[in-house]
Swiss-Prot record:
Membrane-crossing segments per the record: 12-34, 336-353, 360-382, 431-450, 463-485, 528-547, 853-875, 895-917, 949-971, 986-1008
Protein name stated in the entry: Multidrug resistance protein MdtC
Pfam families for the chain: ACR_tran
Assembly description: Part of a tripartite efflux system composed of MdtA, MdtB and MdtC. MdtC forms a heteromultimer with MdtB.
Organism field: Photorhabdus laumondii subsp. laumondii (strain DSM 15139 / CIP 105565 / TT01)
Primary localization: membrane
Membrane topology: Multi-pass membrane protein
GO molecular function: xenobiotic transmembrane transporter activity
NCBIfam families: PRK10614.1, RND_permease_2
Domain of life: Bacteria
GO terms under cellular component: plasma membrane
Length: 1036
C-alpha cells in the first residue's frame, strides 16, 4: 500500500485527478443516448413474396416451399417460420445472436437469387427481404386525415413526401406507411356487356397493356440539329384509358368505357387504416439501433412544422402515438431514486460518525465514483436506460462501503489521538487489503454474467459493466481521495477530550453490548448454529424450486397492442365495421388517450391496433387491470374477438401472435396436425393458468372449389391456362400495367366490378373465347361447389405448424402456465408425430431457467477462486461464502412476502447479494487473521475481537447498501415493475444476512479453524467468557 501513500502526501495531484475523473464523466453523460433498456439486436430477416390472387395453399406450395428449401441451407439459422395467406408469403429467419446481420442478409439475397427459377412466372416482383429487430417497437406513429383528399392520395403524400423526409432525420431507420395503398387506375369490368360484345377478359388485359408502353424511341440527327423522339405512348389517368379500343364488333369499335367502369382509385381496395374509428393513413417510425430515442423523437417533432408546410392545408398531420413520455418519466424516476439513495447513504455515515467533516468525505467520494462511470459507459457504447441507472443506484451503497471502511478505520485512529496524516497512512495500510478484497470479489461475481451469451448476457452486460466500473473507480477513490481528505479535513482527539456518548452513539453502544453477550452464547453453542445454517441451506433449495418464476417483470409502458380475429368467412366491409366498433369502444374508455389501427391485406379477417394509455399519474389502474376490464366490455361484438396485450420494452423472437406467449405444434403430416390442434387448444383453453388462448390455424375460410372437365375443355378448344387466366383477370386484382410518374410508379388494376361479385352467381357470367373465336361460358366446362379452405398456411422449418398463443392471467406466473401446458399435453397422450415446443419469450424463459442455477454457481465458484488467491487459503473463502445462504433465504422470502415472482431482475439481485453480504465476512475474517498472525492469540479470541471491533463498519456498510436499494423498493412511478424486484431482493437479503451472519460467520470460522488444526489443536481461552465479559468497546 506504499503506492497509495503518495496520493495522501500529494493532495493537489489527488484533487486534480479526481476532478479529471468527474469532468470526463460529466462529458460522457451529455453524450450518452437514452433508451428504455439496453439495445439487444436479434438478427432477424423477413422475406416477402407476392402473387396477387393466389390462394394460401398455392402460395405455400409454389412460393414458400422453394424459398424455404433455399433459405434453410443458410448457416446460423436458429428458426425459420413462414405464413402464406391470400396472395402473399412471409418467411421469418431468426439467426444465432452471434451472427452478423449484414452477412446474413447477403446470404439471404444469394438464396433468393438461387430460388428465382423455381418460382411462378406471374409474380409481379421478385421476393425481397428486410431486416427486423423484434425488440424495437415504433418510437412514433403519425396519422394523415383529410375531408377533401381520398385515402389513395393521402397514402401517396405519405409515401412519396413525408416518409422520405422523416427517414432522413438522424436516428430514424425505417418509416412504414399503412392504412391504404398507392393510387391506381382501376378497371372494373361488366361481364354481361363483355359477353354480349364477344370480348374476353384477356383481350381487355392485352389491349390495356399494349396501349400503355414506355420504351426508348431514339433520336434524329442532322448536320445542324439534334432531335429526341417523344411519343404519346403513355397513359396517365383513368380519363386517358377510357377511350382505348379493346375490340371491333361488326367493324364498330368497342371501347374500354363501353365494357368497364374506369376510375382513379387505389391498388388494393381491401386495406383500411383508422384513427379513433375514422379513416387515416399511418406513418410508423422506427429508430436505428443504438440511436438516442428521446433525441430522435425531438428531432422528428422539430421537423413537423416543415412537414405541415409541404402538404396541402386541408390535410391534417397529427402525432397519434409517442413512445417517449413513459421513457422520460421512467428515467426521471430512476434518477430520483439515485439522488435519494446518495442522500440516504450519506445520512448513514453522518449518524454513525456524527461529524460534518467526516460526512463530507463520502459525500464527495460517492459522486466522483458514480459520475466517473459515465465515461466508461460512453466509451463502451452504452446508453442511459433503466438497467444502467439501476446499476448506479445500487452501486451507491457499494461505492460508499469502500469509503466507509477506510474512513471508519482512520477515524478510530484519530479518536485514539494519532495525528491526521499518520492516522490516514496507518489506516489505509491496515484496511487496504480488506478494501481490495471486497472490491475484487464483488467484481468477480459478474465475470460469469459478462461471459454469458444469449439474451440474458446481452441484456445485462451493460448493468454488469456499469456496476463493476463504478466499483473499480470507487476502489481507486477510497485508497487515494478518501484518505487524503481524511488527512487534511479531520482532526485527532486526545483521549481525555473525548465527548460523552449520547444520542445515536449511545444506542449503538447498547446494541454492540447486546451483540457481544449474545455472540459469546452462540460461540458456546456452535453446534446448534451449524444445524441452523444447514437448515437454511436446505430451505434455500426448497424455496428456489417452488417460488413462482417468470421471464421478465410485466411492464406498464402506457401502450397496448390489439389483435382482432373475426369469422374466417367475413367480408372486408364487415371487418372494417367491426374494427370501427372496437376502436370507438376503446377510445371512449377514460384511461385511453388514443387508438389507431388497420385491417386488410392478405388476411381479411385480421386487424391490428396501437392503443396509447393516459400517463400513469392520470389513471388509477395499471395496464393489466385495464386489459381485464376492457376484455369484458369488448366481448359483445358478434363474430369477432379482440385480444389485448401490454407492450413490453423487451420481446424475444421474430414471430407476431395474438398474445404474449406461444406454444407451437409441429407435424410432418398435415392431417395429424389438423386432428390434434383443436383438441390441444380446447384443453389449454380450460386451464385457469392461461387466458386469451387462440390459434393461428385458420382452415375454415369459405372457398368455391371449381372442377374442370378436361375432356369437355379439349373438345371445346379451351386449355387450363386460358381458364386460369380468366379467373385471375376477373377476381385477382390483377396488375396489368404501370404508370410512370416523376415521384412514383402507379399500377393499372383490372377485375370484375364489385357489384357482379356479391355471390357465386358471378361465376356463371364468366366465359372464355375458344380457339374458334366463340364465347364459351365457364359453366359449360366446369362446375363448382362451396368448401372450406385455409386462410393461411404456416410452416416452421419444413414442417406444418400451428401456434397456440396465450396470456397469463393475474395471480399466475409464466412458470405456472408452462408447467400446466406440459402436464396437459402429457395427459392427452399426444402422439410422437405431433411435437410441441414453446416459442418466443416462453422459449427464452425455458432456456434461462436452465442457466440460472449455473450462473449462480459460477458466480460463487468465481468468488471462491478470487478469495482463495487473495488469502492464499482453501478454508477462509469458505468461511466468507458461508454468509450467502442467509442472504438467499432473505431474498426469496421477501419476494414471496411481496407476491413478486422470481424473474431475471431478481436473479441479478441474488448475484448482487453474493457480492454484498460477503463484505461483512471479509471485514471480520481479515481482522481475525491479522490478529492471530500478529497478536499471537487463539482463533476464538481473534474472531470475537474482530466481530466487536468491526461491528460499526459492518453495520454502516450494510445499512448503506440497504438504504441505497430502498428507493427501488419504495418507487411508485413509471418503470416501477423493473425496479421493485431488484430492490426487494437486495433489501430482503441484506436484512436477513445482517441478522444471521454476525453469528454464523464467527462459528464457521472457528469450525474450520478446528478442522485445520485437528488433531493437534490446543484448548485455548479457558477463561474466555470470564475474561471477555464487558469488553464491548466504546463510541465517541
Amino acid at each position: 500500500m506504499k503506492f497509495f501513500a503518495l496520493f495522501i502526501q500529494r493532495p493537489v495531484a489527488t484533487t486534480l485527478l479526481s476532478l479529471a475523473i468527474t469532468l470526463c464523466g460529466v462529458l460522457g453523460f451529455t453524450l450518452l443516448p437514452v433508451s428504455p433498456l439496453p439495445q439487444v439486436d436479434f438478427p432477424v430477416i423477413s422475406v416477402y413474396a407476392s402473387l396477387p390472387g393466389a390462394s394460401p395453399e398455392t402460395m405455400a406450395s409454389s412460393v414458400a416451399t422453394p424459398l424455404e428449401h433455399a433459405l434453410g441451407r443458410i448457416a446460423g439459422v436458429n428458426e425459420m417460420t413462414s405464413s402464406s395467406s391470400l396472395g402473399s408469403t412471409n418467411i421469418t429467419l431468426e439467426f444465432d445472436l452471434n451472427r452478423d446481420i449484414n452477412s446474413a442478409a447477403r446470404d439471404v439475397q444469394a438464396a433468393l437469387n438461387a430460388a428465382q427459377s423455381l418460382l411462378p412466372s406471374g409474380m409481379p416482383s421478385r421476393p425481397h427481404y428486410y431486416k427486423v429487430n423484434p425488440t424495437d417497437a415504433p418510437i412514433m406513429i403519425l396519422t394523415l386525415t383529410s375531408d377533401t383528399y381520398n385515402q389513395g392520395q393521402l397514402y401517396d403524400f405519405a409515401s412519396t413526401q413525408l416518409a422520405q423526409k422523416i427517414a432522413q432525420v438522424e436516428g430514424v431507420s425505417e418509416v412504414s406507411v399503412g392504412g391504404s395503398s398507392l393510387p391506381a387506375v382501376r378497371v372494373e369490368l361488366n361481364p354481361g356487356v363483355l359477353f354480349h360484345q364477344g370480348v374476353s377478359l384477356d383481350a381487355v388485359r392485352k389491349a390495356i397493356s399494349n396501349a400503355n408502353v414506355r420504351r426508348p424511341q431514339g433520336y434524329v440527327d442532322s448536320e445542324q440539329q439534334h432531335w429526341q423522339i417523344q411519343m404519346n405512348d403513355e397513359l396517365k389517368t383513368a380519363e386517358n384509358y377510357r377511350p382505348i379500343i379493346v375490340h371491333y364488333n361488326n367493324n364498330s369499335p368497342v371501347r374500354l368505357q363501353d365494357v368497364a367502369n374506369v376510375k382513379d382509385s387505389v391498388q388494393n381496395v381491401r386495406a383500411a387504416g383508422m384513427s379513433g374509428g375514422e379513416p387515416a393513413i399511418l406513418l410508423i417510425i422506427r429508430r436505428e439501433a443504438g440511436a438516442n430515442i428521446i433525441a430522435t423523437v425531438n428531432r422528428i417533432r422539430e421537423q413537423l412544422p416543415a412537414l405541415h408546410e409541404s402538404i396541402p392545408a386541408s390535410i391534417q398531420l397529427k402525432v397519434a402515438q409517442d413512445r417517449t413520455p413513459t421513457i422520460r418519466a421512467s428515467i426521471v424516476e430512476v434518477e430520483r431514486a439515485l439522488v435519494i439513495a446518495i442522500g440516504l447513504v450519506i445520512l448513514v455515515v453522518f449518524l454513525f460518525l456524527r461529524s460534518g467533516r467526516a460526512t463530507l468525505i463520502p459525500a464527495i467520494a460517492v459522486p466522483v465514483s458514480l459520475i466517473g462511470t459515465f465515461t466508461a459507459m460512453y466509451l463502451c457504447g452504452f446508453s442511459l436506460n433503466n438497467l444502467s441507472l439501476m446499476a448506479l443506484t445500487v452501486a451507491t451503497g457499494f461505492v460508499v462501503d469502500d469509503a466507509i471502511v477506510v474512513l471508519e478505520n482512520i477515524s478510530r485512529h484519530l479518536e485514539a489521538g494519532i495525528k491526521p496524516m499518520q492516522a490516514a497512512l496507518q489506516g489505509v495500510r491496515e484496511v487496504g487489503f480488506t478494501v481490495l478484497s471486497m472490491s475484487i470479489s464483488l467484481v468477480a461475481v459478474f465475470i460469469p454474467l459478462l461471459l454469458m451469451d444469449g439474451l440474458v448476457g446481452r441484456l445485462f452486460r451493460e448493468f454488469a459493466i456499469t456496476l463493476t466500473t463504478s466499483i473499480s473507480i470507487s476502489l481507486l477513490v477510497s485508497l487515494t481521495l478518501t484518505p487524503m481528505m481524511c488527512a487534511h479535513l479531520l482532526k485527532s482527539q486526545r483521549p481525555k477530550a473525548q465527548k460523552k456518548i449520547r444520542g445515536f452513539g449511545k444506542v449503538l453502544l447498547k446494541i454492540q453490548q447486546v451483540y457481544g453477550r449474545s455472540l459469546m452464547w452462540v460461540l458456546n453453542h456452535s453446534r446448534w448454529v451449524l444445524l441452523i445454517l444447514a437448515g437454511i441451506i436446505a430451505l434455500n433449495v426448497w424455496l428456489y424450486i417452488n417460488i413462482p418464476k417468470t421471464f421478465f417483470p410485466e411492464q406498464d409502458t402506457g401502450r397496448l397492442l390489439g389483435f382482432v380475429r373475426a369469422d374466417q368467412s367475413i367480408s372486408f366491409q364487415s371487418m372494417r365495421e367491426k374494427m370501427k366498433n372496437f376502436m370507438q369502444t376503446i377510445n371512449a374508455d377514460p384511461t385511453v388517450d388514443s387508438v389507431i389501427g388497420f385491417t386488410g391485406g392478405g388476411r381479411v379477417n385480421n386487424g391490428f391496433m396501437f392503443i396509447s394509455l393516459k400517463p400513469l399519474k392520470e389513471r388509477s389502474e395499471n395496464a393489466e387491470q385495464i386489459i381485464s376490464r376492457l376484455r369484458i366490455k369488448l366481448a359483445n361484438e358478434p363474430g369477432a374477438n379482440l385480444f389485448l396485450i401490454p407492450v413490453q420494452d423487451i420481446r424475444a423472437g421474430g414471430r407476431q401472435a395474438n398474445a404474449s406467449y406461444q406454444f407451437t405444434l409441429l407435424a410432418d403430416d398435415l392431417n395429424d396436425l389438423r386432428k390434434w390442434e383443436p383438441v390441444i387448444r380446447k384443453a389449454l383453453g380450460q386451464l385457469p393458468q392461461l387466458t386469451d388462448v387462440n390459434s393461428d390455424k385458420e382452415d375454415k375460410g369459405a372457398e368455391m372449389a371449381i372442377i374442370y372437365d378436361r375432356d369437355t375443355m379439349s373438345r371445346l378448344g379451351i386449355n387450363v391456362s386460358e381458364a386460369n387466366n380468366l379467373l385471375n383477370n376477373a377476381f385477382g386484382q390483377r396488375q396489368i400495367s404501370t404508370i410512370y410518374q416523376p415521384l412514383n410508379q402507379y399500377k393499372v388494376v383490372m377485375e370484375v366490378a364489385p357489384e357482379y361479385t356479391q355471390d357465386v352467381s358471378a361465376l356463371e357470367k364468366m366465359f372464355v373465347i375458344n380457339n374458334q373465336g366463340k364465347a364459351i361460358p365457364l359453366s359449360y366446362f366446369a362446375h363448382w361447389q362451396p368448401a372450406n379452405a385455409p386462410l393461411s398456411v404456416n410452416h416452421q422449418g419444413l414442417s406444418a405448424a400451428s401456434t397456440i398463443a396465450f396470456n397469463v392471467p393475474e395471480g399466475y406466473t409464466l412458470s405456472d402456465a408452462i408447467n400446466a401446458i406440459e402436464r396437459t399435453t402429457t395427459e392427452l397422450r399426444v402422439p410422437s408425430t405431433v411435437r410441441g415446443t414453446f416459442a418466443g419469450t416462453a422459449q427464452i424463459f425455458q432456456e434461462t431457467l436452465k442457466s440460472q442455477l449455473f450462473l449462480i454457481l459460477a458466480a460463487i465458484i468465481t468468488v471462491y477462486l478470487v478469495l482463495g488467491i487473495l488469502y492464499e487459503s482453501y478454508i477462509h473463502p469458505l468461511t466468507i461464502l458461508s454468509t450467502l445462504p442467509s442472504a438467499g433465504i432473505g431474498a426469496l422470502l421477501a419476494l414471496e412476502l411481496f407476491d413478486t415472482p422470481f424473474s431475471l431482475i431478481a436473479l441479478i439481485g441474488i448475484m448482487l447479494l453474493i457480492g454484498i453480504v460477503k463484505k461483512n465476512a471479509i471485514i471480520m475474517v481479515d481482522f481475525a487473521i491479522e490478529a492471530q498472525r500478529n497478536g499471537n492469540i487463539c482463533a476464538r479470541d481473534a474472531i470475537f475481537q474482530a466481530s466487536l471491533l468491526r461491528f460499526r463498519p459492518i453495520l454502516m456498510t450494510t445499512l448503506a447498501a440497504l438504504f441505497g436499494s430502498l428507493p427501488l423498493v419504495l418507487s411508485s412511478g413509471d418503470g416501477t415493475e423493473l425496479r421493485q424486484p431488484l430492490g426487494i431482493t437486495i433489501v430482503g437479503g441484506l436484512v436477513m444476512s445482517q441478522l444471521l451472519t454476525l453469528y454464523t460467520t464467527p462459528v464457521v470460522y472457528l469450525c474450520f479453524d478446528r478442522l485445520r488444526a485437528y488433531p493437534n489443536r490446543r484448548n485455548c481461552c479457558r477463561q474466555f467468557e470470564h475474561g471477555q465479559r464487558g469488553k464491548t468497546g466504546t463510541y465517541t
